[in-house]
Amino acid sequence: MSERKAVIKNADMPEDMQQDAVDCATQALEKFNIEKDIAAYIKKEFDKKYNPTWHCIVGRNFGSYVTHETKHFIYFYLGQVAVLLFKSG
């Protein structure tokens, strides 16, 4: 599988957690092909590791406007796929 370059577009999150998000998304993309399944994997992993409630959107073309808890937001690309991950609630 080709190496996907991670490009962080926007983040309000500690750097170690950002790296976790990229690593988790990389694992998800290796395991799943359907964007919904990729998002579910990332969300569930972050719920386990950093406590609920995380939300994750994965896709190639979407807009967003969300409210998130301080220091719990990241938006990045992994290759052609965008990942929006944030904690709210």
Curated annotation (Swiss-Prot):
Mainly localized where?
cytoplasm
Q: Does the keyword Cytoplasm apply?
A: yes
Q: Name its cellular compartments.
A: Cytoplasm, Cytoskeleton, Flagellum axoneme
What are its GO cellular component terms?
cytoplasm; cytoplasmic dynein complex; microtubule; motile cilium
Which UniProt keyword terms apply here? Answer: Cell projection, Cilium, Cytoplasm, Cytoskeleton, Dynein, Flagellum, Microtubule, Motor protein
Q: Which Gene3D superfamilies match?
A: Protein Inhibitor Of Neuronal Nitric Oxide Synthase
Q: Which GO terms describe its biological process?
A: intraciliary retrograde transport; motile cilium assembly
Listed SMART domains: Dynein_light
Gene Ontology molecular-function annotations: dynein intermediate chain binding
Q: Quaternary arrangement and interactors, per the entry?
A: Consists of at least 3 heavy chains (alpha, beta and gamma), 2 intermediate chains and 8 light chains.
Entry similarity comment: Belongs to the dynein light chain family.
- PANTHER family per the UniProt record, alphabetical: DYNEIN LIGHT CHAIN
Q: What is this protein called?
A: Dynein light chain LC6, flagellar outer arm
Where does this protein come from, organism-wise?
Heliocidaris crassispina (Sea urchin)
